[in-house]
UniProtKB/Swiss-Prot annotation, chain A:
The keyword Metal-binding does not apply. This is Acyl carrier protein. 4'-phosphopantetheine is transferred from CoA to a specific serine of apo-ACP by AcpS. This modification is essential for activity because fatty acids are bound in thioester linkage to the sulfhydryl of the prosthetic group. It comes from Gluconobacter oxydans (strain 621H). The lineage of its organism: Bacteria, Pseudomonadati, Pseudomonadota, Alphaproteobacteria, Acetobacterales. Transmembrane segments: none annotated. The gene is acpP. Belongs to the acyl carrier protein (ACP) family. Residues 2-77 form the Carrier domain.
Length: 79, 428
């Protein structure tokens, strides 16, 4: 797993208070990890802060799973 | 109260919960209170050395079993950061009260007949402070989505209703330091009028932060002369008093319509015996000479007590904040009780826990119920040299054993808002 993936996972565990084993790439923040819409807003902010990236609202709306977040951030960092 | 609107519905207290500088827990707080312990110490929530007032009554951290605050025992870790501390403390007291009452709505009708009215004087002050720093440092887009629901006063009521499924009236009182009494009194009326059969009511406060202490310092309301001797700082009616001591915590009761409580065999702490309110229409922070507003609030409470007189009242839990206003309340109580003042006991429990602002009236109403139950009047600590004499026994230094059937509690708030509530022994 990449450094980015590790860090994303850590942020999710911390913010949603879920067990690390549940934070699989396909896990949906809302359906699998107990987040509500406000939690996902806060998660995106935490990603922005941790990775020094801007995630516009329309992009944030498409980030539904752990993998979505990792892919988006990796793409931004590669650009 | 007369007329048909209330159908003679009586309101009793079937659950109590307290978070105070003496302990987390209604009974441990009460035990320490009547032992004469003080919950006042140097402020540790932040470094107070820049401010003239440096002592307060902070809720102690520690294991729940020892009366300390272990937040994860009350609020799941992942939810804690979505709430200001005043919500944490309010929920801890409310959960105690609900569990103490044993009330668990079984069906939708029960849920819809159970409401919540828990207020606060100030709300999420530390949250607002932190949020404004985020915005002023150019990071407005980073402001937490939980900023607003963390600071809003009615969110204790909101969170509690979500936790237990209470779908009745969901409300919150905001009347500064009178909040707790107004919440219990107003919630009782909702039950009397049939809007609910059960109401969880009270107040919570957590304003011991730099902004809160600095604000009350600027208003010249806080004690500044006992920073080196914190337990001596809160001294209601004493000639050396020099301002109030900020406290934090929460008090919550479960109010229940009498027949509802009887049907389920609930334990009954006491009955709401009367409730009265008034406004000073005088000054934003100071009561008028003679404290006519306090007099009228007590009179109004007696008026709708169903026939009680001043001769029936055995104990007054005073507002008594350790400020100049103490003697004005004393004037009003003496005038109100007349000849009956001679047999009255009156104490200020703020001498031990400080002034819990929006939680004060609720915590003090619970002390009245415990005083009635145990036949013990809690003391006024530090009343070494009363600024003036009175025929009223102000229970200096040590608790007294005394039969108490009826107690009255006063709370007054900035803006000139006054509330008095009468608690009485439950009799069929």
């Amino acid at each position: 797993m990449s450094d980015i993936a590790d860090k994303v996972k850590k942020i999710v565990v911390e913010h949603l208070g879920v067990d690390e084993s549940k934070v699989t790439p396909d896990a949906s923040f809302i359906d699998d990890l107990g987040a509500d819409s406000l939690d996902t807003v806060e998660l995106v902010m935490a990603f922005e802060e941790a990775f020094s990236v801007e995630i516009p609202e329309d992009a944030a709306e498409k980030i539904a799973t752990v993998k979505d977040a990792i892919d988006y951030i990796e793409k931004q960092k590669a650009a | 109260m007369s007329g048909t609107a209330t159908n003679g519905r009586r309101v009793v207290v079937t659950g109590i919960g307290v978070v105070s500088p003496l302990a987390v827990g209604a009974e441990l707080t009460w035990k320490r209170l009547i032992e004469g312990q003080s919950g006042i110490g140097r402020i540790t929530h932040f470094d107070p050395s820049e401010l003239p007032a440096q002592v307060a009554g902070q809720v102690p951290d520690g294991p729940t079993a020892e009366g300390g605050l272990t937040l994860s025992d009350w609020v799941p870790v992942k939810d804690q950061k979505k709430m200001d501390r005043f919500i944490h403390l309010g929920l801890a007291a409310a959960i105690q009260a609900v569990e103490d009452s044993g009330w668990t709505p079984e069906d939708e009708d029960d849920r819809c007949a159970t409401g919540v009215m828990i207020g606060s004087g100030i709300g999420g002050l530390q949250t607002i402070y932190d949020g404004s720093l985020t915005v002023s440092s150019g990071k407005a887009r980073r402001l937490s989505p939980f900023f607003i629901p963390s600071a809003l006063i009615n969110l204790i009521s909101g969170h509690l209703s979500i936790r237990y499924g209470f779908k009745g009236p969901n409300h919150a009182v905001v009347t500064a330091c009178a909040t707790g009494v107004h919440a219990i009194g107003d919630a009782s009326r909702l039950i009397q009028y049939g809007d609910a059969d059960v109401m969880v009511a009270g107040g919570a406060e957590a304003a011991i932060c730099s902004l809160g202490i600095a604000g009350f310092c600027s208003a010249r309301a806080l004690s500044t002369g006992s920073n080196d001797d914190p337990t001596k700082a809160s001294r209601p009616w004493d000639k050396d008093r020099d301002g109030f001591i900020m406290g934090e915590g929460a008090g919550v009761v479960v109010l229940e319509e009498l027949e509802h409580a009887r049907r389920r065999g609930a334990k009954i702490y006491g009955e709401i015996g009367g409730y009265g309110m008034s406004g000073d229409a005088y000054h934003i922070t100071a009561p008028a000479e003679g404290h006519n507003g306090a007099f009228r609030a007590m009179k109004a409470a007696l008026r709708n007590s169903g026939g009680l007189t001043t001769a029936d009242i055995d104990y007054v839990n005073a507002h008594g904040t350790s400020t100049m206003a103490d003697d004005l309340e004393l004037d009003a109580v003496e005038r109100f009780f007349g000849d009956d003042a001679k047999r009255l006991a009156m104490s200020s429990t703020k001498s031990a826990i400080g002034h819990l602002l929006g939680a004060a009236g609720a915590v003090e109403a619970i002390f009245c119920l415990q005083a009635i139950r145990d036949g013990i009047v809690p003391p006024t600590l530090n009343l070494d040299n009363p600024a003036r004499d009175s025929v009223i026994d102000r229970v200096a230094h040590v608790a007294q054993q005394r039969k108490i059937d009826v107690a009255l509690s006063n709370s007054f708030g900035f803006g000139g808002t006054n509330a008095s509530i009468i608690l009485k022994r439950f009799k069929d």
